[in-house]
Amino acid sequence: MSLKKSPFFELRSGSVDTLLFTVKTTDLDALRAELVKRFEATPEFFADDVVAIDVRRLAEGERVALSDIRQMLNDVRMRPVGVVAQASQAWAAEAGLPLLEARDRRGATAKPEPADEAEPPVAAAAAEAVPEPAPELAPSAPTTGAQTLVIDRPLRSGQQIYAKGDLVVLAPVSHGAEIIAEGNIHIYAPLRGRALAGVHGNHDARIFCTCLEPELISIAGIYRTTENPLPADILGKAVQIRLEEEKLMIEPLRLT
């Protein structure tokens, strides 16, 4: 007997990309306090973001109450959809969340961590390490096995673009819009929304932008928001953004 294809739904194999919330401690009180501190200042940046709880950074034998962490994330308006764990962490299946497989090789770059506020990662701070601005828009390292995605339309508030390789945007990214890439991001227009590069732990990824006015910028989990205003010499200017020793460095670009 043959079965007709349903006109109403299909079940197909596929994959869904999500960001990782990496748990580094079993002290849930400290974790809760840090969550509140981290997100109360900029709640809208992460509202309704889908995340997977990553417990691979915990030491062997350590366990946490994943149901409590799930509730913590719900309290800050994030949506946990699964758990990423080592094969030896069988207890992770007890939370009632599905076990997910992460593609990253470094083992846990979670939701972005803020750049060190004690040393603002701006062009002035990077002067000693890089005395001259970068000469051109060029990717720092190729992303293997993934095609570059090119977007030539404006992105409005609420829209999101995800690229498995490098991402090139040729139109403005408005407030409330989000662009995410596993590789580098090139924006040949004003960036007023959020840009997250190297989201699966690519510390060599960079962001290149001809007009920097962002809500948030992030590379490999290290992020910076407008809570820490950008200096006048890079705000609205052409820049490149890279990581140096876990700090975001924002440097002018020489385009002529």
From Swiss-Prot:
Keywords of the record: Cell cycle, Cell division, Septation
A Pfam family assignment: MinC_C
Signal peptide coordinates: none
Disulfide feature: none
The UniProt record lists the keyword Cell division: yes
Residue numbers spanned by region Disordered: 105-143
Keyword Protein biosynthesis: no
Biased composition (Low complexity): 120-142
Family matches, as SUPFAM superfamilies: Cell-division inhibitor MinC, C-terminal domain
GO BP term, example: regulation of cell division
Highest taxon of the lineage: Bacteria
InterPro entries, per database record: CAP/MinC_C, MinC, MinC_C_sf, MinC_N, Septum_form_inhib_MinC_C
Role description: Cell division inhibitor that blocks the formation of polar Z ring septums. Rapidly oscillates between the poles of the cell to destabilize FtsZ filaments that have formed before they mature into polar Z rings. Prevents FtsZ polymerization.
HAMAP family xref list: MinC
Oligomeric and partner information: Interacts with MinD and FtsZ.
Assigned protein family: Belongs to the MinC family.
Protein name: Probable septum site-determining protein MinC
UniProt organism field: Burkholderia vietnamiensis (strain G4 / LMG 22486) (Burkholderia cepacia (strain R1808))
Gene coding for it: minC
